A protein has these predicted regions:
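Conserved aromatic anchor
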Residues: 382-392
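A non-catalytic alpha/beta surface segment that caps or lines the substrate-entry region
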Residues: 40, 48-126
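Metal-dependent peptidase/peptidase-like ectodomains
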Residues: 189-298, 306, 310
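N-terminal secretory signal peptides and thylakoid transit peptides that target proteins
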Residues: 1-17
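Alpha-helical metal-binding/catalytic segments enriched in His/Glu/Asp
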Residues: 137, 142-143, 148-196, 354
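Beta-strand-rich modules
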Residues: 424-442
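Extracellular fibronectin type III
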Residues: 439-453
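Active-site-adjacent mobile loop/cap segments within catalytic or ligand-binding domains
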Residues: 57, 222-239, 288-365
Length: 453
């Protein structure tokens, strides 16, 4: 039980709870971008992104089963080039960024006919205040054609997924000289097209280490806002897929959820709300309440399976003549995932969305832990408790809430640097969350409470 000095009581009338946002203060997590974040966004360059995409395409194929020792063609050549570039970026970090090759042998598996070495290229920018808190961003550098087992034909993979790797590498370049408070990890993973093998290994390695991964973003197919007919219906929109009910939910957790609700309050759904709140100008993040596209997947699922909050960025409308296709012209239509179909200004905008989200997360306090609603007695008020964070610049907490039918937080109230608060609102009628705030006004994602045991 927290001491009395760590408690607060907040009275909110029923009328205020149902009133417009202005009645209780805005609930958005975002603040005006800092000068440092604005500088970061300005440094992201479409021409550098284009150079990365074209270089990756130049390796002919990056199929997971292609050559690993040919110096100019195949996944090994791509791996070595990405590693060398990441090392070059790290040279500007003053030792804060390290680069590694995370290799493992994938045994015979679906789409892996023989034991195969798979390698992730990982650059880690160590946090300056809470380095144990980790945020991950990935793109996959392997590619494929129509036959997922064909490791010989050219598989340029410009959109899927040189575009995502370009986002990751450009972020690593721009942020290498910065000092984020938490650790940011930039990873080009392999084996995605064969079964998410690279990200699966990476996520399991974090789980085995007990790593505190508080968010992960997969950038997969982020190359253009063009539609299949060549128009640009949404060239300033990027989709963000976020699950509701956690993939890792246990049977016991499901039983509780069915009793108290919260299908839209899992950690990944809160991450989606956060990204929307801090999106930079010039790009609309369209949050989709689904784990991924219909019956499909990407590397974020590997992290969701381990209980880590994760989401997937992807372009607004995929062109299936360019995706998973042999390069050819058929009935006057050009098939294949070619660099000429990428919009490098668009990819740069996606990179800026990622940068705003990652930097805002890393500079804010961590997501509150141990958030519960006191259920020891029947009352029309609600008592919330949580663990006080240890960040040196932690200023306090905010309680947020919304109607049960609302998609996003509607109201917020600052409650101070306490670990318990009683609010004159019924837990029956609204959904609550708690988020941390630092001295500069950076807010964490909200954490939804569980019933106390």
């Amino acid at each position: 039980m927290a001491k009395s000095s760590r408690r607060a009581f907040l009275t909110v009338s029923a009328a205020a709870a149902a009133a417009p946002l202005v009645a209780t203060g805005g609930a958005r997590a975002g603040t005006a971008p800092s000068g440092e974040l604005k500088a970061i966004l300005r440094q992201i360059e479409p021409r550098r992104i284009e150079a990365i995409v074209r270089k990756l395409v130049s390796f002919g194929t990056r199929h997971t089963l292609s050559s690993q020792d040919d110096p100019v063609r195949g996944i090994g050549a791509a791996r070595d080039w990405i590693f060398a570039e990441m090392q070059r970026y790290a040279a500007a970090s003053g030792g804060r960024m390290t680069v590694e090759l995370q290799s493992f042998v994938q045994p015979v598996s679906p789409r892996i006919p023989a034991p195969t070495t798979i390698t992730n290229v990982i650059a880690t920018l160590r946090g300056s205040v809470t380095p144990e808190r980790i945020y991950v961003v990935t793109g996959h550098y392997d590619s494929r054609v129509t036959d997922v087992m064909d490791a010989v034909k050219d598989a340029p993979g410009a959109d899927d997924d040189a575009s995502g790797v370009a986002v990751v590498m450009e972020l690593a370049r721009v942020l290498a000289g910065r000092r984020p408070e938490a650790t940011i990890v930039f990873a080009a993973v392999a084996g995605e097209e064969q079964g998410l093998y690279g990200s699966d290994h990476m996520a399991q390695a974090y789980k085995d280490q007990g790593a505190d991964v508080q968010a992960m973003f997969s950038n997969d197919i982020v190359g253009t806002g063009d539609a299949h007919d060549g128009t640009r219906p949404a060239n300033r929109t990027v989709r963000l897929f976020v699950e509701g009910v956690p993939t890792s939910e246990t049977a016991a957790e499901a039983t509780v959820r069915k009793s108290v609700g919260g299908e839209n309050d899992g950690p990944s759904r809160q991450l989606g709300r956060f990204v929307k709140d801090v999106e930079p100008g010039g790009t609309d993040v369209r949050v989709i309440w689904r784990r991924d596209r219909y019956l499909r997947g990407s590397d974020h699922i590997s992290f969701l399976l381990r209980g880590y909050p994760a989401a997937r960025f992807t372009e607004p409308r995929e062109n299936f003549a360019h995706e998973h296709q042999d390069v050819r012209v058929e009935n006057g239509i050009q098939y294949g995932d070619l660099a000429e179909f990428c919009d490098f200004d668009y990819i740069a905008r996606v990179a800026r969305v990622n940068a705003a989200a990652l930097w805002s997360l890393a500079q804010a306090p961590g997501t509150p832990r141990g958030v519960v609603i006191d259920t020891t007695q029947l009352t029309n008020a609600t008592t919330l408790r949580w663990q006080l964070g240890a960040e040196p610049d932690l200023a306090g907490y905010e309680v947020v809430w919304r109607e049960t039918t609302a998609a996003d937080w509607q109201h917020s109230r600052a409650v101070g640097k306490v670990s318990e608060v009683t609010i004159d609102l019924s837990k029956d009628n609204v959904f609550f969350g708690v988020r941390a705030v630092d001295a500069d006004g950076h807010r964490s994602p909200a954490a939804a409470p569980r019933p106390s045991s």
